């Protein structure tokens, strides 16, 4: 997952290479994007993963010992322990013009420990999103989405296979569009013929 998401939006657990991809990672990335929208610039524009971790801890504060349990690398844990103490910044002061509820949501999305980070359901119920979310008007997928399409003959698809499949899809779409256009043209011609008679 090192390259799944741009560094500036990577959750600490990705930077520390200690997590399977989870929804908590997406919540972190979404929090970074929301902060960027409010501040009109990236919140954590790290130059490399160490710089990225330093920027994160300067903004959200250094993690305490209990928040390091998910860090499986001793080296990474030692690095985090040696960081100078930094208390969390107040997002309301960081974004004084922003809706305080937006700042509250960002603060809950950008928690170092993925287990303590707000989840999707809590995000959707957050007062900042109240006007955008209606439980009674919630689209629901017919079936869980899988990424099985990424597998090809028992392994990950090569770049060439992806290109070939995209081209195949485009050709099929082109045929459908042309068929519909021909059908439409035929219907129009038929209508014109009846008008002439």
Task: Give the predicted meaning of each segment.
Residues 2, 16-22, 44:
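Activation segment
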Residues 14, 37-38:
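Hydrophobic anchor on a C-lobe helix of Hanks-type protein kinase catalytic domains
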Residues 26:
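Conserved catalytic-loop aspartate of Hanks-type protein kinases
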Residues 117:
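Conserved HRD-motif arginine in the catalytic loop of eukaryotic-like protein kinases
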Residues 130-196:
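C-terminal intrinsically disordered, low-complexity extensions immediately downstream
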């Amino acid at each position: 997952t090192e390259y799944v998401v741009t560094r500036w939006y990577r959750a600490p657990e990705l930077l520390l290479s200690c997590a399977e991809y989870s929804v908590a990672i997406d919540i972190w990335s979404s929090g970074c994007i929301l902060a960027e929208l409010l501040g009109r610039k990236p919140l954590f524009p790290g130059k490399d993963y160490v710089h990225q971790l330093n920027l994160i801890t300067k903004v959200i504060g250094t993690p305490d010992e209990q928040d390091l349990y998910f860090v499986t690398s001793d080296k990474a844990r030692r690095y985090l322990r040696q960081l100078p103490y930094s208390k969390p910044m107040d997002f309301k002061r960081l974004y004084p013009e922003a809706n305080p509820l937006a700042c509250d949501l960002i603060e809950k999305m950008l928690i170092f420990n993925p287990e303590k980070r707000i989840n999707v359901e809590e995000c959707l119920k957050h007062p900042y999103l109240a006007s955008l979310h209606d439980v009674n008007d919630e689209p629901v997928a017919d079936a869980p989405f899988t990424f099985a399409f990424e597998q090809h003959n028992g392994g990950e698809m090569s770049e060439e296979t992806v290109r070939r499949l995209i081209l195949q899809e485009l050709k099929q779409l082109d045929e459908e569009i042309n068929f519909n256009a021909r059908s439409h043209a035929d219907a129009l011609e038929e209508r014109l013929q009846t008008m002439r008679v």
